Each structure stands twice: as C-alpha cells, then as structure tokens.
C-alpha cells in the first residue's frame, strides 16, 4: 500500500482514535481507478468527517465508502440493563479489561453482536462489550428517585422478614409509589418490591449547589470508607477513583463524565481556600 495513502488515512481517522467514544477502523482497497474504503465507523458523522479529510489531503483521488459499515445505523436498537450491575468490557469476555459498570436501568444502544455479547453505546457515549443476557428490550420504569445509600435491599413485602427481591446500588434510578407501613413501592429494571424511603432521594431535587449539597457529598463520601478498589468499578462492591467521584456527584444531583481525564477537561479551576465537597 502506498505510504501516502496510509498516512492520509491515519491522519483522517486520528480525531476518532479514543476507543471509549469512537469507532473508526478503516482500510483502503485500490480497485477500478477508485480507492475503496472498508471497515466500520461509529456513525455517519464520523464517515463524513473522514471523507472530507481524505478529499482535502488527496483531491485527485476517487473515493468509494460504500463498503463501510456504520454501527449507529438502522440495525442499532435500544436496550436496558436488567440486572443490578453489569460490566462494560473492552473485549467480549469477562476476562478482558472492565471499563465501567452500568447500573440497572441504564439505557444501552446495541450496535453489533458476537455470540452472547453485544457491542453497545451507553447514553453518556461510552462504548464497550456487554453480556447480552443482562439486557432487555423493554425500557426501565420512568424514574422518580435514585438509591441514596451505598446499597439497599428490595423486599417482596413491606417488612424486613420478607424475601429479598434484589439489591440495588447507589445511584440506581427507581420509580417510587406510596406503599404501606412506612414503606414505599419501588420499580426498577432489575425488579420491584418494597424499600425504606429514607434510603432514596428524589431526582427533582432543585436545591442550589450550595453548602448543603456540598455537605451531602461529604457525608456520602464517608459511607464508602473500606470499599475495595476495583478498576472500572462503580459500586460498594468495588469502585475506582473516577467512578467514586462520579457517583458522589450523581448522588448530589450533578452529572460529570466517567473517567478522570474527561472529568478534568470538563471542570474549571477553583481557588483556595478549599472546602469539603
């Protein structure tokens, strides 16, 4: 392959090299006076941007992108995480690197399948492989609250002696309805039952980002003392540094990105004196 072609393609794909958010895996196949692209890209916007860059770099070349597979096309379909916690893996295997752990109710866009694994996009743009059996086609119940404790147990009846239906982790969205005997009925993508309302927080909390919410984040942070470090973890079973920061903000009603470098890029400088939260 001509070195000039390889360089042009590499430069055209360079802006889409972060595999956490992009797919741009292309090769050039010469034929019939044209330069044919094959491979896969995440979406039409990626393919369009690559084609523009190639045409600018090699204006006399005739390009054909008809064989490129666009993942976010008509075949993509929405699904929902239907277990309390699952992995977003770099490869279609539990033995590969874990990138994150979506909770019950997380929206998933399935882009392609490989046996019992699917390559998926989360609603925050992260990409990875997920175990197909832990997803379902039905959307999660429309949430009104999120789990505010490190974890809660959901019971089949409104008492602590009833069978446990499931365990839900901090930050999991749930739909809450009035229950009985001081309990509330909760519905999630991982199951429904009864829970203690003191362990839930409304999603429509309109309190300003003031000292009260900073104090809440400080209080929540202390609840995770002793939790083991787990690369890609997001729960009391194991959590990493950026997942911990994201979860504490989520519990305080603030959405921030998943990974530390993206969190840093999205932040702003603050000046001393620094305060907890």
What are the language-model segments listed below?
Residues 1-95, 99-101, 106, 132-137, ...:
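N-terminal targeting leaders
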Residues 3, 212, 235-239:
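Soluble non-cytosolic domains of exported or imported proteins
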Residues 24-25, 48-77, 93, 114, ...:
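Boundary regions of SH3-family modules and the immediately adjacent low-complexity/disordered segments
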Residues 84-93, 149-159, 259-267:
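Short, structured beta-strand/loop micro-motifs enriched in basic residues and often containing a Trp
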Residues 105, 168-174, 276-277:
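Loop/turn positions that initiate beta-strands
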Residues 221, 233-252:
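Active-site nucleophilic cysteine motif
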Residues 254-277:
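...with weaker cross-activation on analogous glycine-rich loops/strands in unrelated enzymes
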